[in-house]
Amino acid sequence: MLTELRIESLGAISVATAEFDRGFTVLTGETGTGKTMVVTGLHLLGGARADATRVRSGADRAVVEGRFTTTDLDDATVAGLQAVLDSSGAERDEDGSVIALRSISRDGPSRAYLGGRGVPAKSLSGFTNELLTLHGQNDQLRLMRPDEQRGALDRFAAAGEAVQRYRKLRDAWLTARRDLVDRRNRARELAQEADRLKFALNEIDTVDPQPGEDVALVADIARLSELDTLREAATTARATLCGTPDADAFDRGAVDSLGRARAALQSSDDAALRGLAEQVGEALTVVVDAVAELGAYLDELPADASALDAKLARQAQLRTLTRKYAADIDGVLRWADEARARLAQLDVSEEGLAALERRTGELAHELGQAAVDLSTIRRKAAKRLAKEVSAELSALAMADAEFTIGVTTGLADHGDPVALALASGELARAGADGVDAVEFGFVAHRGMTVLPLAKSASGGELSRVMLSLEVVLATSRKQAAGTTMVFDEIDAGVGGWAAVQIGRRLARLARTHQVIVVTHLPQVAAYADVHLMVQRTGRDGASGVRRLTSEDRVAELARMLAGLGDSDSGRAHARELLETAQNDELT
């Protein structure tokens, strides 16, 4: 629940702190003192758009700070709130409470804080919206909208799981339909793409390039282009190292010379010379190996230019591929791998199209069944909700009023992109929230024709319809017990006995919820457990919030009773009203 609200420089309020208890709290005050700013502050904590024009004149920023406790909530709600705190890095105070804060700058961006941590406004609202339910005169206007009416019915019916299942199937159905339409429209394009890929892969496979082959060919061609020069160099080097058969005794090559040198050194008894003999022997081994490698090199050299021609022809084949598919052969091979993968994805067979058609049909059937199931839930809940709201209206001095809820199938044209055939044969429009059109109906006196709520209810009647609806939703535990419900002048257009009944109903609601009401009706204010008054505190027009004592309450109620605050008769009337309300057993 909300235990404290601090407002600074918001509208008419300069600095104000209000403390709240369990039960029923009312805020009253003269017109223009800033009562609505209290609710505006709570809306800001709930993530409402920050409006810099709300910052009080002369101030740089406005601040709204709320302190919340969770001790009165059920375990599931507490666990959900704690998850929000943990994900935001927010911390509780030592007493277990949580501080939520919103700061609005006149010139810069607004900021949000939760448990001492800066958070996005969405995170702040994720926490406070679990604790606060705010209702104002604008909500009465929203109640006339079909989507708001459907949302209220779904809350009462606890239809969230059925709605989510429907939405999931609808998303899958729409995706399958898009895929099917795309498949049909692109069948020719896909077939042409497949032909191009097959041709390219066949061309590449025919050439059969190997990784790095184009680079190796460049080196091979360079070598073969200088074949005579290479052969002469290798032959000369080999002859120099091993000699020739017709050489004289002094020019038989390095091998023979090194062999004779080693033998001469080995024949000596001198240790130093014998050590040198080993070094010469090592040199001889190196030279002999070089001679062998030169021989192998000469054997591998082509005898004519045909090898060069073959290499050049192969290079021309590879260049045909690199001109079309990639800059080098390794790139061509990568392109081929990607092309094979793409070709595997391109299912251009009739079987693939038929499979898509079957899948789309299956999803349409499942979606149709989910839509019917959701409609059944809504239709059953609509009867109960209408009955309970009508009963609440009777308790609010509207005994002859009748509230109805119509749930009908929204029909679609054949050209509608979300037309869905139901098992009943109806062609329904599969909207994001189902195929149902939900409409609240109302008539103030039974026997008259029931009309849509937007066309039949006056301002005062609409206030009572909304209160009745919220009471039913709250008492049916669709609004967690222990949470805070805020009503901003929803009793507009109401007076007399109806106002008394509204006060009684709000007081009963406060048995399970914290109820905070901004009102101009003394009959409603008299039923409150705590009475807060918003009043001007200085010549600059600033306002503050004051908690009223018993005598103060009498004076304020007398003022609200047609401005009779200073008269004995006004106080007597106010005292009687207060005593009657406080002694009401609320049965």
Curated annotation (Swiss-Prot):
Similarity field: Belongs to the RecN family.
| Annotated binding of ATP, by residue | 29-36
Which species does this protein come from?
Answer: Mycobacterium tuberculosis (strain CDC 1551 / Oshkosh)
A Gene Ontology biological process annotation? DNA recombination
Could you tell me the superkingdom of the organism this chain comes from?
A: Bacteria
Keywords, alphabetical: ATP-binding, DNA damage, DNA repair, Nucleotide-binding
Instruction: Give any Pfam family that matches.
Output: SMC_N
| Extent of the signal sequence | none
This molecule's function is given as: May be involved in recombinational repair of damaged DNA.
Q: Which GO terms describe its cellular component?
A: bacterial nucleoid
PANTHER family from the UniProt entry: DNA REPAIR PROTEIN RECN
The name on file for this protein is DNA repair protein RecN
MF (Gene Ontology): ATP binding
